[in-house]
């Protein structure tokens, strides 16, 4: 958590204003949700490691006394601070979808909180800026999200960046074909996501530490060691070719729209840690 001096807040306001201007010009509408969420919702979400980083709010009065008497630590809190903006959006949309346009193109820029050890680049309180399109399952929605986001970045002076893209469905299909059980795929994906940080040997070691089938781990390690992991090679192990076709379409279209100002690339190890990511994922 940190304070902002007047000049720092002015810069933040300017950057946020430019980003919102780009998003609104493309038809996105801004919403706001409470910082506090019911613990029942937070705990039932599929937020990966973030579930261990929730700032919990103690119950009050008689409810707290009853919780203390129960001896169950989980009974002490009934609310917590949001750790991202996706869970609040899901709850918001479920409660209000009849009042919203279809598809719903939404902006969120708000503070989120994670109870982790502060370090460079990681704060316990920070601002997230999200855009989402709800109600459009076509690959054109993915293309639009990439296009609008990159235009926002270009508008505040960034260039020469790379948009990495993957689809968790393709990755999961490949992993299942290698012998990993369906109920272990999220765990395997989280480890595979660390490829850039710990390398192929580190990924293999961590998967073995998780006591996953050695034959499946070796199959994945051999696949990686064979050379560059291409989309065609991964897609060949996926049961549904339409998923790979959609990803190829998004890559080709996004590259054409980039017009050389930035790069768009397939990244086979890109997963994102949260389990609620089930389709295409991006990272810039």
Indicate where each model-derived feature is located:
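Auxiliary tRNA-acceptor-end handling modules of aminoacyl-tRNA synthetases
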Residues: 1-12, 58, 66-71
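Ser/Thr-centered flexible coil motifs
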Residues: 5, 181, 210-213
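Positively charged, Gly/Ser-enriched RNA/tRNA-binding surfaces
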Residues: 11-26, 37-38, 73-76, 84-159, ...
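Beta-rich nucleic-acid/ligand-interaction surfaces
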Residues: 33-52, 165-177, 270-279
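Polyanion/phosphate-binding surface patch
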Residues: 35-79
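Acidic, His- and aromatic-enriched active-site or binding-groove loops in soluble protein domains
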Residues: 50-66, 179-208
């Amino acid at each position: 958590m940190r304070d902002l001096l007047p000049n720092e807040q002015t810069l933040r306001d300017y950057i946020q204003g430019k980003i919102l201007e780009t998003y609104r010009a493309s038809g996105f509408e801004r919403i706001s949700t409470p910082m506090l969420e019911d613990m029942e919702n937070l705990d039932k979400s599929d937020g990966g490691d973030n579930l261990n980083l929730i700032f919990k709010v103690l119950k009050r009065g008689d409810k707290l006394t009853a919780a203390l008497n129960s001896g169950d630590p989980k009974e002490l809190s009934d609310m917590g601070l949001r750790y991202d903006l996706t869970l609040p959006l899901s709850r918001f949309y479920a409660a209000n979808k009849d009042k919203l346009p279809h598809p719903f193109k939404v902006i969120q820029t708000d503070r989120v909180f994670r109870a982790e050890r502060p370090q460079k680049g990681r704060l316990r309180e920070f601002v997230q800026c999200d855009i989402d399109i709800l109600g459009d399952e076509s690959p054109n929605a993915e293309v639009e999200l990439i296009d609008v986001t990159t235009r926002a970045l270009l508008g505040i002076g960034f260039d020469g960046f790379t948009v990495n893209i993957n689809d968790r469905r393709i990755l999961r299909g490949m992993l299942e074909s290698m012998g990993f059980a369906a109920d272990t795929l999220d765990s395997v994906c989280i480890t595979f996501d660390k490829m850039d940080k710990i390398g192929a040997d580190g990924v293999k070691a961590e998967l073995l530490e998780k006591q996953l089938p050695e034959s499946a781990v070796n199959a994945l390690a051999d696949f990686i060691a064979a050379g560059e992991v291409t989309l065609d090679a991964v897609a060949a192990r996926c049961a549904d070719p339409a998923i790979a076709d959609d990803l190829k379409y998004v890559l080709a279209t996004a590259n054409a729209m980039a017009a050389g100002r930035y790069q768009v690339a397939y990244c086979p190890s890109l997963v994102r840690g949260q389990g609620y990511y089930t389709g295409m994922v991006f990272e810039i």
